[in-house]
């Protein structure tokens, strides 16, 4: 029984130390950052670009591009409102032609409330509503 109590006490002492380390970990500065993801074959001989994510001077994601071995598969561009929330997400095909775009509305807490998806000609394709339930 004493061993169990000593073990539990030691475990409780380690929890705050782990939390402090997580809080002290430096956050990645995303200002003007470009992240490139590469795929390499098992032998390390053939390297191909897989995905690129670009952030602006404010650290907001402004573009994502997905690649295949044949080149660009698709591209997403992100636009922001005056509150710094994504207001539109535009999706382009491999030839940079607009395919679909999404518009977003947010609730009073800044969480997504409604997502509208349109085709390239502006026809509404779908509406997604978000519901947040605290438990």
Feature-to-residue mapping (PLM):
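Bacterial N-terminal signal peptides
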Residues: 7-16
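Positively charged n-region of N-terminal signal peptides that target proteins for export
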Residues: 1-4, 21
């Amino acid at each position: 029984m004493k061993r169990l109590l000593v073990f539990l006490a030691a475990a409780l002492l380690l929890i705050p130390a782990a939390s402090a380390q997580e809080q002290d970990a430096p956050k990645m500065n995303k200002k003007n950052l470009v992240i490139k993801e590469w795929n390499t074959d098992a032998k390390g001989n053939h390297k191909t670009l897989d995905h690129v994510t670009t952030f602006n001077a404010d650290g907001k994601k402004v573009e994502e591009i997905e690649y295949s071995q044949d080149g660009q598969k698709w591209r997403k561009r992100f636009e922001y409102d005056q509150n710094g929330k994504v207001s539109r997400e535009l999706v382009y095909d491999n030839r940079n032609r607009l395919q679909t775009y999404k518009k977003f509305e947010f609730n009073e807490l800044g969480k997504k409330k409604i997502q509208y998806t349109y085709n390239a000609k502006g026809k509404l394709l779908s509406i997604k509503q978000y519901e947040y339930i605290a438990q």
